[in-house]
Regions:
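Glycine/small-residue-rich phosphate/adenosyl-binding loop
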Residues: 46, 50, 54, 58-69
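Acidic active-site catalytic centers that drive phospho-/nucleotidyl reactions
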Residues: 7-9, 48, 100, 119
């Protein structure tokens, strides 16, 4: 079964009124992965979303909490010590940030074939996970 991991920027753009095209694309991706039951996020993604939404997007914390509550149709993966160890290996092997490596580690553990992210190199494979930029058409 096809499984897709959604990086924090997908959730952030879904709430970003200053980026209407990216907002449209992010919302479409969230709807599709939730409807198909193949969307995966991690606690890291939810935590990063809350901080970014309330600080950068100036969304009221209660509103951000309500947005988080709408994510229940996505599988929520809790982080493990093994994820952290694999992320450290990923930093060394792939020369990516620890936080990006932690996303890749969680996606691999969830058996996702793709990570949707704007932050990593689109088209590149990290282990068994391929990165796709869902906003490529918005920035082209």
């Amino acid at each position: 079964m096809y499984r897709a991991f959604l990086d924090t920027n997908v959730l952030v753009y879904a709430s970003d009124r200053d980026e209407p095209e990216k907002r449209r694309l992010a919302r479409a991706l969230l709807r599709a992965t939730a409807a198909d039951g193949n969307g995966v996020i991690s606690t890291q993604v939810v935590q990063e979303f809350f901080v970014t939404a309330t600080r950068k997007l100036a969304i009221d914390p209660l509103r951000a909490k309500a947005i988080v509550a709408t994510l229940h149709r996505l599988e929520l993966l809790e982080g493990t010590l093994e994820d952290i160890n694999q992320a450290i290996d990923g930093v060394i092997l792939w020369q990516v940030s620890f936080w990006d490596a932690l996303i890749l580690s969680a996606a691999g553990r969830a058996r996702c074939s793709v990570v949707y992210s704007e932050d990593l190199n689109a088209g590149q494979r990290y282990g068994g996970v391929e990165v796709k930029n869902p906003f490529a058409e918005a920035t082209a």
